[in-house]
């Protein structure tokens, strides 16, 4: 059946899927930092708690981490914790009077001369990027205050100064963000603040880093180096926020554990109408190689202050699911919004509805046809297990995986049922929260040797499937696990009728 034939058969009157494949990342802020508020978010559908290190002190984020863990423990859940770095930024300096108003047609000079750092005026103000005059040529644009104010460069006055034409009305205040669309920007991946934040994250045992403004694969490696030996198991999710990141996406994906399509800054750095193209391309590339991908920014933004989303926002979330995103993310909606629980519940419902419109077998065949032959044995086993799940219409898949690699490989091939991963590592439980369809179950391996506890772990997973109503007595569950007499990869697939 083609995608078009599948779409024709869709009906709003059919029951929706019993499980939600897509995961939800929630930004934690004043509206949701308490243990009780976090418990409500978790009950509503939060999988990963995001801390935005552009704001707040280490003490503030320490409280968030403690509260997330306390709330998760009370509910018996394994919630991932993500540290989102501030990243390298370009900003204006200070203004002599605190703010300046501009009108269309005004002429202003921008300078990298430190003498103007704290005494900006309507005629001249400071930008803290020393290479500014080399990066932007006459005719180019400078976006100020996250793109709200635009300047067109008229001429280069000297090695530190550009004369610019103001394109629109705006009241500009201190330390506003600068974007240089289409320009090659040379900034370090890890600022001094980022380095301290990463050290804090390692000490606190966060599960993943959302690395901001990644432009090259080398910058991903810089973040990995900053995490050090103690942080070697932390996932790095690279945020794509500018044209350089899009241009270098293949090597960035290879160097990263996952990708975030951060559409806010991306929509400033490239034309807004091209963001949907970048989003679909990046998500598809991640799908082909089996790396988790998050779609973020302005997804249900109106619910920061309104109890219901706009129809366009609903379509946006659904489109991210249809594109193939593993996760969708909420920012201010949960950090400072009036309706944090409602927005997560709404997003969860949208994701489930959008699942019905995805043609899973088409996705499976497309991904498999794009793989290089010969496959590695582990991937061959996992892809064959997914094929079996489609053929027998399995209600669930069960995988025994300590690192989560096998669970991710199974997820890569997009089965249309939940993937229950029984693991002996709590960190694996939390990190798999960014992987589509995977639900983790922790097994305490200290009770017995690994060879002896295999069937106990299988039973634990089957009992969990029944308890959570993923499957019922008589339903088929596809089980994937290793035979420890043959080392190296999970080489057994079993079809079990749930007792």
From Swiss-Prot:
Record-listed ATP binding positions: 52-55, 91
Which UniProt keywords are listed? Allosteric enzyme, ATP-binding, Glycolysis, Kinase, Magnesium, Metal-binding, Nucleotide-binding, Potassium, Pyruvate, Transferase
**E.C. number, please?**
2.7.1.40
Name the cofactor(s) required for activity, per the record: Mg(2+); K(+)
| Activity modulation comment | Activated by fructose 2,6-bisphosphate, activated by the effector in a cooperative manner.
Q: What InterPro entries does its record include?
A: Pyr_Knase, Pyrv/PenolPyrv_kinase-like_dom, Pyrv_kinase-like_dom_sf, Pyrv_Knase-like_insert_dom_sf, Pyrv_Knase_AS, Pyrv_Knase_brl, Pyrv_Knase_C, Pyrv_Knase_C_sf
Q: Which Pfam families does the annotation name?
A: PK, PK_C
Binding of substrate occurs at: 50, 264-265, 297
Give an example GO molecular function: kinase activity
Pathway assignment reads: Carbohydrate degradation; glycolysis; pyruvate from D-glyceraldehyde 3-phosphate: step 5/5
Q: Which reaction does it catalyse?
A: pyruvate + ATP = phosphoenolpyruvate + ADP + H(+)
Q: Could you say which protein family the record assigns here?
A: Belongs to the pyruvate kinase family.
Please state what the protein is called: Pyruvate kinase 1
Q: Which organism is it from?
A: Trypanosoma brucei brucei
